[in-house]
Design a protein with these regions (language model features):
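Accessory carbohydrate-recognition regions in carbohydrate-active enzymes
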Residues: 20-376
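Bacterial Sec-dependent N-terminal signal peptides
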Residues: 1-21
Length: 379
């Protein structure tokens, strides 16, 4: 049945790609360009960043193991999670990351045990929307991002044992399940060095379906008698019975400032569904990429140009947040304090001063003004 479902999904995806018409520059972009890389040989050293231009949080289907700088490689055939990432390059690696993963059948947390086979034929990757079929779990995962939040939608099979894993990774983390609110909160301190001692990325997930199974995870041990865990490597599982084709929606946000700010950042999603969020993201991308119009009879040239332009406007990363009063605030990577004003990060000055910042100054001057005033190297 799973193979039949994958075949049907592939046919529909192929039909959609064939029928697709170019209506904006974002349609030329492939986030998968440059992902067929490995440590020994780079063909780009990129990952498919599902994000908005200069967004605070990116999302990536995670094929690499926890801590692997090559988070997604095109030649991989298994996804082990959908990771919120802030990684500027595999060499700098990541910080503040955590992962979400749907599973069915057995309640598992281990990243190898929960991993699922996938095919690029059943994968749709755009800057503003991602979709993939996880064959081992018979689950379709969809993601649509905003600057600091994202909407997930999981389409489950008929199963008495459908779960969602939240993995806050190692180096010190905390996760708490709140069944009365269909909510999971927590923080991750995962980083690759160079952060203040009080560094945390606080996250919140809100589901639209009540939990019938809950468990906290500490050091790989799943404990159904606990709702929270503080550990070097903490996580959680929640579960429910699902009907065939039942969709479970999850709204996710995070903050480097506080748990309360993470809740505020969740409001970026408003009451929009995933299609509406994706449509708004598409418009943002078309507006940004549309600053440059290229005319060429060779569609491969257009795909190459706009895929590279997409990469050029991902960074510097916005590292600021909007508080309850509407004021711009940021967590300082210099001293660990919460301060007023903008902050941008994740740019390598040794390279970007040559081309990127002059380019931003020409094409996106208002953005570049703030960047030049408030930019930090990667934490």
């Amino acid at each position: 049945m799973k193979k039949l479902a994958l075949f049907a999904f592939t046919l529909l995806s192929a039909w959609a790609m064939t029928a697709k018409t170019i209506t904006g520059p974002v349609d030329y972009v492939s986030p998968l360009v440059g992902t067929q890389s490995k440590h020994a040989l780079s063909t780009g050293n990129t990952y498919p960043a599902i994000a908005l231009p200069w967004g605070m949080n990116f999302w990536v289907p995670q094929t690499g193991k926890m801590g692997d700088g090559w988070a997604y490689t095109y030649d991989a055939d298994k996804i082990r999670g959908f990771k919120q990432t802030h990684q500027p390059s595999p060499w700098i690696n990541d910080y503040g990351q955590f992962a979400i993963m749907p599973v069915t059948g057995k309640a598992v947390f281990n990243q190898d045990e929960r991993a699922s086979w996938f095919s690029h034929k059943a994968e749709t990757a755009t800057p503003y929307y991602y979709k993939v079929y996880l064959a081992d779990h018979d689950v379709v995962t969809e993601i649509a991002p905003t600057e600091r939040a994202a909407a997930f939608r999981f389409t489950f099979p008929e199963n008495d044992h459908s779960y969602v894993v939240v993995d806050a990774f190692d180096k010190g983390s905390f996760v708490k399940v709140i069944p009365s609110e269909n909510k999971i909160i927590g923080y991750t301190t995962k980083n690759s060095g160079g952060v203040p001692a009080n560094f945390k990325n606080y996250f919140v997930l809100v589901f639209d379906k009540p939990f019938t199974y809950t468990a906290a995870v500490a050091s790989g041990v799943i404990d159904t008698n606990k709702l929270e865990a503080t550990d070097n490597h903490a996580g959680a599982l929640i579960g429910f019975k699902t009907r065939k084709g039942e969709q479970v929606n999850v709204r996710v946000a995070s903050s480097f400032i506080s748990p309360e700010q993470a809740e505020l950042n969740l409001k970026e999603l408003g009451t929009d569904n995933i299609e509406q969020i994706a449509a708004k993201g598409r418009k943002v991308w078309n507006d940004v990429l549309g600053r440059i119009e290229v005319k060429d009879d060779d569609i491969d040239h257009l795909r190459t140009f706009y895929s590279c332009l997409y990469r050029s406007v991902l960074f510097p990363r916005s590292f600021y947040e909007i508080d309850a009063k509407g004021d711009v605030m940021h967590y300082s990577p210099y001293n660990g304090e919460v301060l007023p004003g903008y902050m941008f990060t994740d740019t390598g000055f040794w390279d970007t001063f040559r081309c990127l910042f002059p380019f931003l100054n020409l094409m996106y001057p208002s953005m570049n003004t703030n960047c030049l005033l408030y930019t930090s190297p990667s934490p």
